């Protein structure tokens, strides 16, 4: 294993792991994908209608809906308060775990452990399900597991002269104690903090793992990966979660629901199930940025008995989203161990924006550290960490390279694995390294897909999902998209399909040098007030697509 000089390591950070910890003495942890919850649809034609909240509804939440709209300044102040409180909670958990050394607190994997424990402790529905399942298992003679507890793998520091190593230890907590500590620290139920953590984990999953199996299972081509943002977000992530999901993720949810309805024709006679299905489609419609796309969703909504034809329509819709990108909110989500360092970093602001300067400045001030798994390259690991924090899995690598001054590589060229260390790799004396990539320039985050202009692309991933609002050509593999356009458009909604295909072809015919986010510039990281706009310099020798020819392990193959 690699090791690290004590003097070369400072403060810490985290990254996100894909699973929620299953508690107990011998329970294995596995990714959780929840079925659709059954909340009534919103009639408001907002861009991102309020989704279902599995375990995050309360009287306080209901009261919040009646409050007057906050001003931008009030929002930034409340966000600052949230991230500071998350940091305080992390420090309290580390004290309870008996890990008081700065090295231990700065480690990404320790922050991961605290985040997973918090999510497991606050997921009442999952806990209830686990208890009922375990009660049945005990009757069958299986081992009894205490689901009132949850735990995680932490890493304790070991010093050896001028070298430090980390050794894994398993620590468990009572769920009620964790919940009480969190609510007391946050001063409320802290739903926004939980959502923030969930989005961070989802962004890390998008960067570290491919989702080819999940795409193929619903009949979508793996080249549509750029539309699949947020595919591991749990439903309890609420409105915020829907806003950060890609169009393909919502299409996949709808196709899975139709598959269930085809197997059980009585499913959509249940008003609750029908409401949940309509909610998914309404969310999908509001994601769409073109009238032709919305019209196609309307066709599916109007179908009395959803079936193969509707799946074909949704598949075409997902393909169109490669060219005309839907609205996907981008956020900077940092590990809570970085938030815990805000007082020491001298980050003295009263306001904080997850989509603007403050988040990027905080990222640059922090010095995150990660465990290195066997064969990991520290610089490559730093790229994974940067892309995780900024949700940049599907951003153009040329843009990221211009902002950081570091040449970014596609996933297949990176010599590193994800941040979660599987049990079989946890050994005594693991090395660590600084995550060294920093921003030289900054630009605001975006929530739109930019214009439908195209450039040259590669194989594998065939389009980008912009994260930074800075003028640039949008990378798009026209050849790959044209292959997808050769499909049958006959049937009940031939006109709707024809209009959508025409829109895609018109878009493809545009000049390749057209730019998205016209007039948007980047700024020096020291230029908080945007006084000196700078034209972005795109380096043509760097590949566009992170998942161009992917060799990453699939999320569904992980054994936690």
Swiss-Prot record:
InterPro entries per UniProt: Flu_NP
Superkingdom of source: Viruses
Keyword terms: Capsid protein, Helical capsid protein, Host nucleus, Host-virus interaction, Ribonucleoprotein, RNA-binding, Viral nucleoprotein, Viral penetration into host nucleus, Virion, Virus entry into host cell
Span list, region Disordered: 1-74
PTM text: Late in virus-infected cells, may be cleaved from a 56-kDa protein to a 53-kDa protein by a cellular caspase. This cleavage might be a marker for the onset of apoptosis in infected cells or have a specific function in virus host interaction.
GO biological process, one term: viral penetration into host nucleus
Job description of the protein: Encapsidates the negative strand viral RNA, protecting it from nucleases. The encapsidated genomic RNA is termed the ribonucleoprotein (RNP) and serves as template for transcription and replication. The RNP needs to be localized in the host nucleus to start an infectious cycle, but is too large to diffuse through the nuclear pore complex. NP comprises at least 2 nuclear localization signals that are responsible for the active RNP import into the nucleus through cellular importin alpha/beta pathway.
Annotated family: Belongs to the influenza viruses nucleoprotein family.
Protein name stated in the entry: Nucleoprotein
Organism (species): Influenza B virus (strain B/Ann Arbor/1/1986)
Lineage summary: Viruses, Riboviria, Orthornavirae, Negarnaviricota, Polyploviricotina
């Amino acid at each position: 294993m690699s090791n690290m000089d004590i003097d070369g390591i400072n403060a810490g950070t985290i990254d996100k792991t894909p699973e929620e910890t299953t508690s107990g003495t011998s329970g294995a942890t596995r990714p959780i994908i929840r079925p659709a919850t059954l909340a009534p649809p919103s009639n408001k034609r907002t861009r991102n209608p309020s989704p279902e909240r599995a375990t995050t509804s309360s009287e306080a939440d209901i009261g919040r809906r009646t409050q007057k709209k906050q001003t931008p300044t009030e929002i930034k102040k409340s966000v600052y308060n949230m991230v500071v409180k998350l940091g305080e909670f992390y420090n309290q958990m580390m004290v309870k775990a008996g890990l008081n050394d700065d090295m231990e607190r700065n480690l990404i994997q320790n922050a991961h452990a605290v985040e997973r424990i918090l999510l497991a402790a606050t997921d009442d529905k999952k806990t209830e399900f686990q208890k009922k399942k375990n009660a049945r298992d005990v009757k069958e003679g299986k081992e009894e597991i205490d689901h009132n507890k949850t735990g995680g793998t932490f890493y304790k520091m070991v010093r050896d002269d001028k070298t430090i190593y980390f050794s894994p230890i398993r620590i468990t907590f009572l769920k009620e104690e964790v919940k009480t500590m969190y609510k007391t620290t946050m001063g409320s139920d802290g739903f926004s903090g939980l959502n923030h953590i969930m989005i961070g984990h989802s962004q890390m999953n998008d960067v570290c793992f491919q989702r080819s199996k999940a795409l193929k299972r619903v009949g979508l081509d793996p080249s549509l990966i750029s539309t699949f943002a947020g595919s591991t977000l749990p439903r309890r992530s609420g409105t915020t979660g829907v806003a950060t999901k890609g169009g393909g993720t919502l299409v996949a949810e709808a196709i899975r629901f139709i598959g269930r309805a085809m197997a059980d024709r009585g499913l959509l006679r249940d008003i609750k199930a029908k409401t949940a299905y309509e909610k998914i489609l309404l969310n999908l419609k509001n994601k769409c940025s073109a009238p032709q796309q919305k019209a196609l969703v309307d066709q599916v909504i109007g179908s009395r008995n959803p079936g193969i034809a509707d799946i074909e329509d949704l598949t075409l819709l997902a393909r169109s989203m490669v060219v005309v990108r839907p609205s996907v909110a981008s956020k900077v989500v940092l590990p809570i161990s970085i938030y815990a360092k805000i007082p020491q970093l001298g980050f003295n602001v009263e306001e904080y924006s997850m989509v603007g300067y403050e988040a990027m400045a905080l990222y640059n001030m922090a010095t995150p550290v990660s465990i290195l798994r066997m064969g990991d390259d520290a610089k490559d690991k730093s790229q994974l960490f940067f892309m995780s924090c900024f949700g940049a899995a599907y951003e153009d690598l040329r843009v990221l390279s211009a902002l950081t001054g570091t040449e970014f590589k596609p996933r297949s060229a990176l010599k590193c694995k994800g941040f979660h260390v599987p049990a079989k790799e946890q050994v005594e004396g693991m090395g660590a390294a600084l995550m060294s990539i920093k921003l030289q320039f900054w630009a605001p985050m975006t929530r739109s897909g930019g214009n439908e202009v195209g450039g040259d692309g590669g194989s594998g991933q065939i389009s980008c999902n912009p994260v930074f609002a800075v003028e640039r050509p949008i990378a798009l593999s026209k050849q790959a998209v044209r292959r997808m356009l050769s499909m049958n458009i006959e049937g009940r909604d031939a006109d709707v399909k024809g209009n959508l295909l025409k829109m895609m072809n018109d878009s493809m015919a545009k000049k390749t040098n057209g730019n998205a986010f016209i007039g948007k510039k980047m700024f020096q990281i020291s230029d908080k007030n945007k006084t000196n706009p700078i034209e972005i310099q795109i380096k043509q020798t760097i590949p566009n697509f992170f998942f161009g020819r992917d060799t990453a392990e699939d999320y569904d193959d992980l054994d936690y």
